[in-house]
């Protein structure tokens, strides 16, 4: 019998979800931040190419990068501001055996300097303006839904600077 290291197994406060008939597995908390339908929709929409170097802004649990793993690309740098979610994304990358293709970086998009350009930048960014509306008591959930640590304008500005010539960007963002 083979056992996985404890870090790649869900604990009592987590769930294990499977996609693509179990080819991609994702651990996420039962409460707090949980990815929505936007994540698989974004992953399906993104067209990758062999050799693509990609950057994900706000990876959360790593779900979009993980779902992209069934498509051709060289590597994804998955940027995440929140330490707990960055660690969860690392666990999910390890769980799926993707350390050679997905690197999770804990950092702030407003100060992140990758030192290279990317063929593709993608994100499922927060889209509720600042601290408007209902803020969840979960700081993790609020940061994922509200523009508390960067606006869409800042995300687009930074994306423009990170794209290689001919690069592409993909975002999930409401029409209004």
Where are these regions (language model features)?
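Class I SAM-dependent transferase core
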Residues: 7-49
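Conserved SAM-binding loop
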Residues: 89-90
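Mobile active-site "lid"/loop adjacent to the S-adenosyl-L-methionine
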Residues: 125-154, 158
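Conserved Class I SAM-dependent methyltransferase catalytic core
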Residues: 149-176
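Conserved class I S-adenosyl-L-methionine
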Residues: 51-58
């Amino acid at each position: 019998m083979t056992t996985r290291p404890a870090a790649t197994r869900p604990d009592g406060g987590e769930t294990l979800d499977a996609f693509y008939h179990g080819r991609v597995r994702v651990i996420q908390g039962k409460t707090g931040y949980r990815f929505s339908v936007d994540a698989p929709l974004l992953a399906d929409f993104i067209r990758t190419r062999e050799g693509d170097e990609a950057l994900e802004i706000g990876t959360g649990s790593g779900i979009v990068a993980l779902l992209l793993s069934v498509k051709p690309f060289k590597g994804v740098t998955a940027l995440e501001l929140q330490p707990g979610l960055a660690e969860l994304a690392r666990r999910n990358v390890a769980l799926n055996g993707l350390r050679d293709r997905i690197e999770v970086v804990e950092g702030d998009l407003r100060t992140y300097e990758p030192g290279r350009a990317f063929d593709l930048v993608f994100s499922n960014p927060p889209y509720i303006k600042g601290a408007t509306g209902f803020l969840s008591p979960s700081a993790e959930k609020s940061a994922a839904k509200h523009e508390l640590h960067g606006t869409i304008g800042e995300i687009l500005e930074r994306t423009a600077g990170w794209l290689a010539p001919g690069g592409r960007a993909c975002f999930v963002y409401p029409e209004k």
